Design a protein with these regions (language model features):
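Catalytic domains of riboflavin
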Residues: 1-382
Length: 382
């Protein structure tokens, strides 16, 4: 058991190793997320180990929507298109179309037995797209490659636990609700874990576990660059999951327990960044570097996002609406939640643990910060 703190109270959670062992043995665990995110708990199990009894348990005592997290690769193999083209869910939960297994004894698709068969079919290498009826009663979720190191959601946690247990990277999850229909929070989830003798762990601890064992970035360049703002140290990192290249520019040296002025920036093309550093003026960039020069030390990260095209389309849609309402201001390009984990790993490599975050928007709490080994100690307007 390990201890975690919430609302100034110490609560006992299980270790990630204990949870992996239970997943390997076909048991259900409870996974809780950050209180600043959904602040909920899910029953989680490996899809490979699913049984009708497990589905019935989840439906009876979880009471939420039973879903099956799958890898991007598996969703593509089964031709599972996204439920919607424009995902406006605040947590960006990636629902595909719902499905049922055709034939194989499946009737209505909703019984515990039918749903267990459908889940099993999703990981069966012989299952073809035609074998799955659409819509149905099982809701696949497309997980981000890289797991909780990319996105700190139950979807990715389920995939990570299955993979760490040596099983097919697919899971079964369901939100846990109280008997009165309200969402179960950590105190109630602890009671559920005790009642059914189930291990309970946090995504935060899973992130920390994976940070110790895995990395999604490789440093490719490290040199001093002369910019319009003076000398800065440039490090380039390549993401192992998609080969995107991200850049960190730093000034000065620091200790790990020292709060560091930091800006994490989203960008479309790194070539434009390099041009701006040496030639072209950019007001916002000027303000960032001026702040760091005045401070004497700091870091600016430029994170290339995987969904550049969709991000641009979303911004254009917002711009169109703003123009129709007489608003001239263009929508900002915001940091994608699912890419925050990449920036966190880069900050970790830069020996930055405490952050004075430069921002020109509202103060946004990031989930799983402790798991990443990071703490935002202040927000600095620039």
């Amino acid at each position: 058991m390990i201890s975690t703190k919430t609302n100034n109270k110490s609560i006992q959670l299980n270790t990630i190793e204990e949870a992996i062992e239970d997943i390997k043995n076909g048991k259900v665990i409870i996974v809780v997320d950050d209180e600043n995110r959904e602040n909920e708990g899910d029953f989680v199990a490996a899809a490979e180990m699913v049984t009708p009894e497990m589905i019935n348990f989840m439906a009876t005592h979880g009471r939420g929507l039973i879903c099956t997290p799958l890898t991007e690769k598996r969703c593509k193999e089964l031709e599972l298109g996204m439920m919607v083209n424009n995902n406006t869910d605040p947590m960006e939960t990636a629902f595909t179309v719902s499905i049922d297994l055709r034939g194989k004894g499946v009737t209505t698709g909703i019984s515990a037995s039918d749903r267990a068969k459908t889940v099993k079919a999703l990981i069966d290498k012989d299952t073809k797209p035609f074998d799955l009826a659409r819509p149905g009663h099982i809701f696949p979720l497309k997980a981000k490659e890289g797991g909780v190191l990319r996105r700190t959601g139950h979807t990715e946690a389920a995939i990570d636990f299955a993979r760490l247990a040596g099983l097919e990277p697919a899971g079964v999850i369901v939100e846990i609700m109280n008997e009165d229909g309200t969402m179960a929070r950590l105190p109630q989830l602890i009671d559920v874990a005790k009642k059914f003798d189930i291990k309970i762990v946090s995504i935060e601890d899973l992130v920390a576990y994976r940070m110790e064992h895995d990395s999604l970035i490789e440093k490719k360049e490290d040199f001093t660059i002369l910019t319009r703002f003076g000398d800065f140290r440039l490090r380039a990192y390549q993401q192992t999951t998609n080969n995107q290249v991200h850049i960190a520019l730093t000034k000065g040296v620091w200790k790990s327990d020292e709060p560091i002025l930091t800006r994490v920036n989203s960008t479309l093309v790194n070539n434009d960044i390099l041009g701006t550093l040496t030639n072209n003026a950019d007001k916002k960039l000027d303000q960032m570097f001026q702040a760091i020069n005045e401070n004497g030390k700091g870091a600016i990260l430029f994170i290339n996002q995987q969904n550049q095209a969709q991000n641009l389309l979303n911004r254009l849609h917002i711009l169109k609406e703003n123009q129709a309402e007489g608003e001239m201001k263009a929508p900002a390009m915001t940091m994608d939640n699912k890419d925050f984990g990449i920036g966190a790993q880069i900050l970790h490599d830069l020996n930055i643990c405490k952050i004075e975050l430069m921002t020109n928007t509202q103060q946004t709490k990031r989930v799983g910060m402790i798991g990443y080994g990071l703490e935002i100690v202040d927000y600095i307007k620039y």
